[in-house]
């Protein structure tokens, strides 16, 4: 069986939503027995659409020989979502908010690491300068260590 792609599941979900909307409209305009058959037909269509969606989203073992032909429409079995995003959606929150908060958190972490890196580089340079002045016989070794750790040579 060929793997089910993301676009197939997307189409199935759109069909389910469309059937729900049609049922909502039919219930809102319900006139009694004369519209009952139409409502029953719409409910049967919804049931069929849900069955199709369910069969398409059953967990299948991915085939070893199915190469990902279209990266913009991957097989549904290859898509993995972080549990945090699923929790956001379950809590009726926008997953874009999670993404924004995650990016901001990573940026703050990067700024912290950059500050630490700059502080250690400054400490390295001060230590090297002090060691050169206190122990001139170690000047070559100090210069080698400074170069190896990303610093420039100081004279």
UniProtKB/Swiss-Prot annotation:
One of its GO terms (molecular function) is transcription coregulator activity. Keywords: Activator, Nucleus, Transcription, Transcription regulation. One of its GO terms (biological process) is regulation of transcription by RNA polymerase II. Pfam families: Med10. Residues 54-80 are annotated as: Disordered. Component of the Mediator complex. Component of the Mediator complex, a coactivator involved in the regulated transcription of nearly all RNA polymerase II-dependent genes. Mediator functions as a bridge to convey information from gene-specific regulatory proteins to the basal RNA polymerase II transcription machinery. Mediator is recruited to promoters by direct interactions with regulatory proteins and serves as a scaffold for the assembly of a functional preinitiation complex with RNA polymerase II and the general transcription factors. This is Mediator of RNA polymerase II transcription subunit 10. It comes from Aspergillus terreus (strain NIH 2624 / FGSC A1156).
